[in-house]
């Protein structure tokens, strides 16, 4: 019994540490893009990230869910897209209840993108979605 409790404690601590590291990395990534882009609309990729067609229905479901759960007409979310086209970090522009934000984040994680490209190499990028 003691071993099970100890294992649970170790796993919980590991989860918290990883979550903090991921959060810090996300904040650093968003700060980097904020500094790079500022208020300007500039292209920093040869090919910017784009959503794959298979994610179109997921976006429609996201919009429907957001309309039912919030009072906002639309929600803007900045996402860091990794070099494989998977969203890894999320920043909501509006204030949203934590429970709703968690549900939206879970749904946003299912979206898939064609990654940005620089010199024929897939790279991490930022993408803003309106839901």
Predicted regions located by residue number:
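Sec-dependent N-terminal signal peptides
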Residues: 4-13
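Charge-biased low-complexity segments
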Residues: 6, 18-131
């Amino acid at each position: 019994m003691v071993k099970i409790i100890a294992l649970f404690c170790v796993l919980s601590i590991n989860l918290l540490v990883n979550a903090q590291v991921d959060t810090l990395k996300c904040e650093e990534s968003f700060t980097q893009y904020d500094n790079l882009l500022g208020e300007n609309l500039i292209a920093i990729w040869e090919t910017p990230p784009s959503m794959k067609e298979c994610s179109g229905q997921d976006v429609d479901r996201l919009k429907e869910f957001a309309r039912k759960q919030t009072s906002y007409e639309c929600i803007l979310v900045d996402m860091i897209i990794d070099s494989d086209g998977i969203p890894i970090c999320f920043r909501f522009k509006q204030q949203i209840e934590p429970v709703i934000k968690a549900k939206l984040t879970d749904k946003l994680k299912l979206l898939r993108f064609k990654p940005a490209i620089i010199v024929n190499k897939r790279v991490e990028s930022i993408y803003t979605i309106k839901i």
